[in-house]
Amino acid sequence: RPTWDVNPTRSIDDFKLAFYTDPGDALMRFACMPQFQSDAFFKQRDKLELAMSLPNPVDKFKRIEPRWEPNPDFTYFVHADLAQKHDKCAVAISHVEKWVEMKTFNDYTQVVPMVVTDMVAWWEPKVEGPVDLSEVKNWIIALRRKGLHLGMVTFDRWNSFDIQNELKSVGIKTDTLSVGKKHYEDMAMLIYEDRLIMPHIDVLLDEMLELKIVSDKKVDHPRKKSKDLSDAVCG
């Protein structure tokens, strides 16, 4: 039974903020309507699938489709989740499409971004050897030649010092960003509020659906699974 039935001193209005910030969790905890596996991070598969409405304009050889063109009015942001031997090395490119006014609780309004993840590219280690990070670096540099105005390229901490310096040497701004639970919570908010559009990639969807809440500060993948593409998009 819902909390407001069991406890007459509470009403559904008392939980407006909870339903606004995390509808799936609020349905389970306060309305006794579980929609999902309780330790899953993304609790609404339909919202994830709805957000993945774009084709990914990158083929298996990491070539960007000629028909995809950057918008000169947009600034593009890149995040790379580096890996060489055991995981995929993934790079995602995103931009803010526009800013919109959105009603929040108590009739307040807030100006918030509509975000588009334009593409995701990834490299996998092979029997012959690990991922060549210089190939990843050159792919990022080629984005500028493609016409993208790059605002920032961020990397997780693993093995990114050299590649950051090499990109800086050709005039590309870089920084370090270790994706954590806070970043995933921000992305979940975008998804639940229909403010994120991204490519439909089966690997990415599977990764995001398998993410688990491990602790107050950590979101992680199950054993023998991965979250490489997911981390790239989240960053």
For each feature predicted by the language model, list its residue ranges.
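An acidic- and aromatic-residue-enriched active-site/binding cleft used to recognize and process polar
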Residues: D81-K85, V96, F155-S160, I172, ...
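Nucleic-acid-processing active sites and adjacent nucleic-acid-binding tracks
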Residues: P66-R67, I93-M152
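Short glycine-rich phosphate-binding loop at a beta-alpha junction
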Residues: G147-N159, Q164
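Phosphate/oxyanion-binding active-site loops and adjacent basic polyanion-contact surfaces
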Residues: D87, E128-K137, K225-D231
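C-terminal nuclease/phosphodiesterase catalytic domains that cleave nucleic-acid phosphodiester bonds
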Residues: R29, M33, Q37, F161-G235
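Gly/Thr-rich phosphate-binding beta-strand-loop-beta motif of the actin/hexokinase/Hsp70
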Residues: N71-K98
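Beta-sheet entry/capping signal
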Residues: R1-T3, F74-F77, K88-A90, L150-V153, ...
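ATPase catalytic-site recognition across NTP-hydrolyzing enzymes
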Residues: P2-A80
